Design a protein with these regions (language model features):
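TPR-adjacent "capping" and linker segments in tetratricopeptide-repeat scaffold/adaptor proteins
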Residues: 19-35
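Residue-level recognition of tetratricopeptide repeat
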Residues: 41, 75-76, 116
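Specific register positions within alpha-helical solenoid repeats of the TPR/Sel1-like families, i.e.
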Residues: 44, 78-79, 119
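Conserved structural position within tetratricopeptide repeats
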Residues: 58-61, 96
Length: 122
């Protein structure tokens, strides 16, 4: 039986970089966010809401203050899944994070969606 020789990971990576330049590109944060946004939109087009949520969570993981991603989560809960308590929670997060910026478009949309839910539930 053939014995495997131990290969150090750093040596292996060095060999790959040397023979295949550009084989590994470390994406920047804004590139990852753009990629996750694209994947989110694709998932929404296919009505795969759980997959869309995964990509929104990845965006929020990279940018915890991303109001658009939090608002999009609220809209999925509200309009697609009809999970109103979860939608209200997301909309409240957007409103709290945008406190002091009364004209912020995300905050205005969150307030309008909250009013719509409250009217529907009353």
């Amino acid at each position: 039986m053939r014995q495997r020789l131990p290969i150090k990971r750093s040596n292996l990576l060095s060999a790959i970089f040397r023979h295949l330049p550009g084989a590994w590109i470390d994406p920047k944060q804004n590139e990852l966010i753009a990629l996750y946004r694209l994947r989110y939109k694709m998932a929404m087009d296919e009505q795969k809401y759980d997959t869309a949520m995964i990509f929104l969570n990845k965006i929020i993981e990279l940018e915890p203050m991303n109001l658009e991603a939090k608002l999009a989560k609220g809209e999925i809960y509200h309009r697609c899944l009809q999970n109103y308590p979860a939608a209200i929670e997301q909309y409240n997060k957007v409103i709290r994070l945008a406190a002091g910026r009364e004209e912020d478009p995300a905050q205005l949309r969150a307030r309008a969606a909250m009013a719509e839910i409250m009217e529907m539930l009353s």
